[in-house]
From Swiss-Prot:
Organism whose genome encodes this protein: Homo sapiens (Human)
Record's function text: Odorant receptor.
Signal peptide, first to last residue: none
Keywords from the named record: Cell membrane, Disulfide bond, G-protein coupled receptor, Glycoprotein, Membrane, Olfaction, Receptor, Sensory transduction, Transducer, Transmembrane, Transmembrane helix
Membrane topology term: Multi-pass membrane protein
UniProt subcellular location: Cell membrane
Extracellular topological segments: 1-24, 79-99, 158-194, 259-271
Positions annotated with a glycan in the UniProt record: 5, 88
GO biological process, one term: detection of chemical stimulus involved in sensory perception of smell
Protein name per Swiss-Prot or TrEMBL: Olfactory receptor 2L8
Regions crossing the membrane: 25-48, 57-78, 100-119, 139-157, 195-218, 236-258, 272-291
Family listed: Belongs to the G-protein coupled receptor 1 family.
A GO CC term assigned to this protein in UniProt: plasma membrane
InterPro entries with a match to the protein in the record: GPCR_Rhodpsn, GPCR_Rhodpsn_7TM, Olfact_rcpt
Lineage: Eukaryota, Metazoa, Chordata, Craniata, Vertebrata
Length: 312
């Protein structure tokens, strides 16, 4: 493998786990999760599009989250499945750059979008009379396009860097996708300045939004506590707890992975943590948002009845 790495520009993805007897089990499990994520997120997007009761800022943002998750998991899992089926773990230099770009762009966009969703709930509960003004269609579009553009600019900057640094060591990336920190460890130049920019990016895309989300929900919980309506209080708590669950699943492993000093990082640990925000979160998000949401379940019933009536 060492000779291959020195004469080829391709990278080698070592995968999630070393080869073992239970490879087939992991393959089936990951493909199953991928299909669940595909069905769940597509269903959420179509449901919000087809049911007029869900044409609100909250669900408009949720449909974008599902779109991001759909693309997010599709950037990584199909390549993993292909590697297992064909036994070829190589990925071209350009292919690695493309995968890295989409991973960073979608990851950054999702982090910012989750902050926008927290702001939406903050305005809806703390300033209900101003909700339609502060969360107009124009504001929602600006939030969404801003998330995509900022995430893409950040991704472009990091991808251009990793594609231009010299790789004179083994080209075997100890990961299951082209993760920038894992790629940088293969460089034959000092990258401490760049690692500082990674820390800065992680702070901008993870720490600042998380602080904003925490402050928003601190205000929300205070407002909910003083609500007179028990039903309104229950609904608000349910909505907030759902979003906080999603935020925790996404931010916690990301923050722990990217904000740790290099000396404390472990490739095995990084790969396991990456499973949470690249594979599990896209599958769990539509389930979490729909399982206890009466509006989503009601919309599902209405759309199903409409489809059945058309067939009859």
């Amino acid at each position: 493998m060492e000779n291959y790495n020195q004469t080829s520009t391709d990278f080698i993805l070592l995968g999630l786990f070393p080869p073992s007897r239970i490879d087939l089990f992991f393959f089936i499990l990951i493909v199953f999760i991928f299909l669940m994520a595909l069905i769940g997120n597509l269903s959420m997007i179509l449901l919000i599009f087809l049911d007029t009761h869900l044409h609100t800022p909250m669900y408009f943002l949720l449909s974008q989250l599902s779109l991001i998750d759909l693309n997010y998991i599709s950037t990584i899992v199909p390549k993993m499945a292909s590697d297992f089926l064909h036994g070829n773990k190589s990925i071209s230099f350009t292919g690695c750059g493309i995968q890295s770009f989409f991973f960073l762009a979608l990851g950054g966009a999702e982090a910012l979008l989750l902050a926008s969703m927290a702001y939406d709930r903050y305005i809806a509960i703390c300033f209900p009379l101003h909700y339609l003004i502060r969360m107009s269609k124009r504001v929602c579009v600006l939030m969404i396009t801003g998330s995509w553009i900022i995430g893409s600019i950040n991704a472009c900057a990091h991808t251009v860097y990793v594609l231009h640094i010299p790789y004179c060591r083994s080209r075997a990336i100890n990961h299951f996708f082209c993760d920038v920190p894992a790629m940088v460890t293969l460089a034959c130049m000092d990258t401490w300045v760049y690692e500082g920019t990674v820390f800065l990016s992680a702070t901008i895309f993870l720490v600042f939004p998380f602080i904003g989300i925490s402050c928003s929900y601190g205000q929300v919980l205070f407002a909910v506590y003083h609500m007179k309506s028990a039903e309104g209080r229950k609904k608000a708590y349910l909505t907030c707890s759902t979003h906080l669950t999603v935020v925790t699943f996404y931010y916690a492993p990301f923050v722990y992975t990217y904000l740790r000093p290099r000396s404390l990082r472990s490739p095995t640990e990084d790969k396991v943590l990456a499973v949470f925000y690249t594979i599990l979160t896209p599958m769990l998000n539509p389930i979490i948002y729909s399982l206890r949401n009466k509006e989503v379940m009601g919309a599902l019933t209405r759309v199903s009845q409409r489809i059945c009536s058309v067939k009859m």
